[in-house]
Amino acid sequence: MPALEVRGLKKSFGSLVVLKDISLSIQEGEVVSVIGPSGSGKSTLARCICRLEEIDKGEVLLRGERIDNGKHSNRDIALLVGMIFQQFNLFPHLSVMENITLSPIRILDVPPPEAKERALSLLKRVGMIDKKDARPSELSGGQCQRVAIARALAMNPRILLFDEPTSALDPELVGEVLEVIADLAGTGMTMMIITHEMLFAKDVSDRVLFMDEGGIVEQGPPSELFTAPKMPRTRLFLQRMLATVGKELIQAP
């Protein structure tokens, strides 16, 4: 049974069609990266999966159960899906520790001592234990994103969705966040990563999806999609990316 399955998903904003009949599945423990130009529908797809956007048509199933039909509460969704956003979305008036423990205590009814113990373990995992009492304003963008990842993990979700987690970061801070995500990938966490970091997607993914104009144009193992794409649109996109990341992108491992 797939960890995540999307069937015939369609989404429009007024007359603008954003997602056109999207179907995909992600297996337990699989890491899938979603690449493509800006405006291709990648972020909207993630928001529809975790029900931040209502879909117009189609189905979204997590571990075989539909979550698009209104029968599941936000608490149910939080138990299944964790989402990491571009802008961190940390509460500015709360400490790092409070940001991580708030949802487990309020939504999952986890006793505060247990929530704090779990938070300390996660902060150690993402290299932020020394900042547990800091406010977000005292942290760099990379540090805020690592806290956001720990916060998502604190809910013990079945799958993590990353919506361009490094796009708002200073280039010098990107590596520290990618290192944390790569570590999670190595633990068998099921993940869908929307990213413009092509080399990272090539290295960490089991499978890569290329999206354009609201549809999935091509998908496959990174060793195939990056080195021998079948579709002309995929080839054009990757050729343009070569100017940024160089020949390393298309070299076979």
Please identify what each model-predicted range represents:
Residues D212, S223-P253:
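C-terminal boundary and immediately downstream tail of ABC-type ATPase nucleotide-binding domains
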Residues M1-K10, V245-P253:
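ABC-family P-loop ATPase nucleotide-binding domain
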Residues P2-P222:
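ABC family nucleotide-binding domain
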